[in-house]
Amino acid sequence: MHFHFCSKHSIKSAEKSDILKQQLIIIISNRKEVRQLSQHKNIRTASEEIQWTSRTYGAVIVLIAGLCLLCLGAFLSISLGAADIHLRTVWEAIFHYQPTKTSHQIIHDLRLPRTAAAALVGALLAVSGAIMQGMTRNPLAEPSIMGVTSGSAFAVSIAFAFFPGLSAMGLVLWSFAGAGLGASTVMGIGMFSRGGLTPVKLALAGTAVTYFFTGISTAIAIRFDVAQDISFWYAGGVAGVKWSGVQLLLIAGAVGLTLAFFIARSVTVLSLGDDLAKGLGQYTSAVKLVGMLIVVILTGAAVSIAGTIAFIGLIIPHITRFLVGVDYRWIIPCSAVLGAVLLVFADIAARLVNAPFETPVGALTSLIGVPFFFYLARRERRGL
């Protein structure tokens, strides 16, 4: 492999170039061969010719299997509840809807939007986590851990207290603002910390900001008597979601996921390190800005509809990288599908684990996510 680096320094620059080339070979290749690059006049032209070797067939299998599981989960989610409905009735209600039948009304007005919301929220949170982990090179990054979710819930609590008649779209906009506030606060604390931004330090900053926003939200809830409304957001769940909420999720998802696919290749390079990304001619600041905008859009929409559902954005990206490799052109769609599958089945379990009462779905995702977080934190203990 030949790279032409324009170096103004002699020994140090050459050593640094060798290290960067080794990182590129080891990480991008994912233990597969990287195709030979012909000689180029500059590094930017060379970077355009890099053939990203990825587990393409594995990614396609993951997508197909994930979509099949999602369809199965959707039918189960629609059929199971306070009153079980036969799968044939579910099929008829979806494809031959008759508004005069009570069972069809229950499916169309209650269970279908709930299932659609669960799938969309899971997908949005999973992609948010994948983007955050790629941008920060932090395996612990996730909307609920990095203060994004709590910032969004904090803004929602303000909206409930001071603007009780706010529309659904207005609530989403407040949620967006809170998500941006939470993310910028955590990043600001991390940047000024001693020793720089290590994964565990960033996670600790996110935890501190989360508790701060949660404390203020609780005080607002008590002072303005909106605790009952806010408790839904902190419990997390998709029960009672209407078609209007699904439409908002679809709009936010279309915008956020389109932007995510647009910067997927850049996030792949950025996940290998800022120095390498800059050496390949990438505008890292612009990529991070767009990436943070994506996280704010996706997380803000998810929290405004379903509340603070934690750890989906932590678990799913790690599973996806294990299955499909490091190419974010595959990580993003596979994370979306697997995130949707996880939350749909978690919502089913939330209805069954303590029937006839419902368990908050956020409690079930936390039950899975907390041990996984401790495992990752233990693995990253050297970053303290």
Curated annotation (Swiss-Prot):
It comes from the Bacteria. Keywords: Cell membrane, Ion transport, Iron, Iron transport, Membrane, Transmembrane, Transmembrane helix, Transport. GO terms for biological process: siderophore-dependent iron import into cell. InterPro entries: ABC_BtuC-like (IPR037294), ABC_transptr_permease_BtuC (IPR000522). The chain crosses the membrane at residues 58-78, 115-135, 154-174, 176-196, 202-222, 243-263, 296-316, 330-350, 357-377. It is found in: Cell membrane; Membrane raft. Its main location: membrane. It is a multi-pass membrane protein. GO terms for molecular function: transmembrane transporter activity. Disulfide bonds: none annotated. Part of the ABC transporter complex FhuBGCD involved in iron(3+)-hydroxamate import. Responsible for the translocation of the substrate across the membrane. Belongs to the binding-protein-dependent transport system permease family. FecCD subfamily. The complex is composed of an ATP-binding protein (FhuC), two transmembrane proteins (FhuB and FhuG) and a solute-binding protein (FhuD or YxeB). This is Iron(3+)-hydroxamate import system permease protein FhuB. The gene is fhuB.
